Design a protein with these regions (language model features):
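Conserved short hydrophobic interaction patches
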Residues: 19-22, 78, 82-86, 118-132
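A short acidic-to-branched-hydrophobic micro-motif
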Residues: 47-66
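A generic structural motif
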Residues: 64-68, 105-114
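A contiguous, mid-protein "functional segment" used to position or interact
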Residues: 108-149
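Short, internal acidic amphipathic alpha-helical interface segments
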Residues: 61-102
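Short, highly charged C-terminal tails/helix-capping segments
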Residues: 134-176
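Short, charged/polar, Gly/Pro-enriched secondary-structure boundary elements
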Residues: 43-47, 107-110
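Charge-rich, low-complexity N-terminal segments
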Residues: 1-46, 94
Length: 176
């Protein structure tokens, strides 16, 4: 039995390393069966994923955003609704309220296609949802940051995705 488990771990590690090399991703293996992978993003600069090959499962975790400053229940509701649409991974919250993507896969299911699909799901969940999560949990901070940058003549280019948050709704008494 122990030999079969060791063989499954070794095979899973080989599959993971092959996928990471083929995808030309930046990664390191600080310990046998442990991988730290940097996934490039479009909204979030990058997402770091930890992959750990255990005796029976491959587990993965990736940090998404810190504990929301505001609208925590709205953020959590959005995460739970979004979990219904994800495959192989789900959002999780740690004891500090920070948000992660986590997943677990049985070692016999670790295939090149499966690992690629999991990494794609992590990227979609962490990077694809990044701006939405910022809007939901940090709208006030975004507004303050924008005002601070404008007052100092600094670039607001990386806040362009949030311009709709910066426009104040007009009052009914305002002339059009």
């Amino acid at each position: 039995m122990a030999d079969k488990a060791a063989e499954a771990e070794q095979r899973a590690a080989q599959v993971i390393e092959g996928v990471l090399k083929d995808a030309e991703l930046e990664w390191e293996s600080p310990a046998s069966g442990t991988y730290v992978v940097k996934l490039p993003g479009t909204r979030k600069l990058s997402t770091t994923v930890s992959l750990i090959v255990g005796r029976h499962t491959l587990s993965l975790n990736a940090f998404v955003i810190r504990h929301p400053d505001e609208n925590e229940s709205g953020v959590h509701r959005w995460l739970l609704e979004r979990n219904l649409k994800l495959f192989g991974v789900s959002y999780a919250v740690d004891p500090l309220g920070d948000i992660y993507v986590s997943g677990r896969l049985p070692l016999p299911a670790v295939t090149p296609e499966g690992v690629d699909q999991l990494l794609g799901q992590v990227l979609e969940a962490a990077d694809g949802s990044f701006n939405t999560l910022l809007e939901l949990g940090f709208a006030s901070a975004i507004r303050k940051e924008y005002e601070w940058r404008v007052s100092r003549g600094e670039s607001t280019r990386n806040l362009d995705a949030f311009t709709h948050l910066l426009q104040r709704p007009s009052s009914r008494n305002d002339p059009e």
